[in-house]
Amino acid sequence: MIQSMYPIQKVSRSEFVPIRQLNYHVRQWGTPDKNIPPLVMVHGWMDVSASFQFVVDAMTQDRWIIAPDWRGFGLTDTPNQDNYWFPDYLADLDFLLDHYVGDRSIHLLGHSMGGHVATLYAGVRPERVDKLINLEGFGMAATRPAQAAGRYAKWIDELKTMHKGELDLKPYADLEGV
């Protein structure tokens, strides 16, 4: 058994929920309270719901918190495709909210990519989001249409290199170089 160096203060509950042909892993803290909107926390790219443990432990108010692992991350199934589309994240979130909260409004917190998804979702379903917290979710990088062909060509080349097993990660001399 792996022992954590961090002393967890509020233990989460884990469960799996069928969402859009995937077995979604969802972590929860606290108990549902009809007087307090649930807090839904969505993580960023290459992250997991357990990363919110530090935030949950720092909260002084006991409340119901729902944090899924996005498709392909953590313990949630990986779809049978090699890409992830933002509309899928929006739909997954909508189905998860149907399952857990029905027509109740929520407080929605997203970090990084999750912040971008949360902001998009609040725009698509404003009636479901009572409060929005966006942590470092700056959105997609700004590019010009004229850059598209070159960016796609580079992406295809990198994809082929990866599939051949020849992808080398770029080394950095120090933190400044990153």
Region spans (language model):
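Alpha/beta-hydrolase fold catalytic core
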Residues: 1-39, 60-64, 101-104, 139-140, ...
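Active-site loop/oxyanion-hole signature of alpha/beta-hydrolase fold enzymes
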Residues: 19-22, 27, 33, 67-109, ...
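Conserved HGGG/HGGXW glycine-rich cap/lid loop of the alpha/beta-hydrolase fold
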Residues: 25-78
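A conserved amphipathic alpha-helix that caps or lines the catalytic cleft of carbohydrate-
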Residues: 56, 97, 121-122
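Conserved G/P- and acidic residue-centered "switch" motifs that form tight phosphate/ATP-binding loops
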Residues: 72, 114, 131
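Core-facing hydrophobic residues within beta-strands of well-ordered domains
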Residues: 103, 128-129
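Gly/Ala-rich beta-loop-alpha elbow adjacent to hydrolase catalytic centers
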Residues: 110, 114, 118
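Flexible "cap/lid" loop of the alpha/beta hydrolase fold
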Residues: 120-123, 130-174
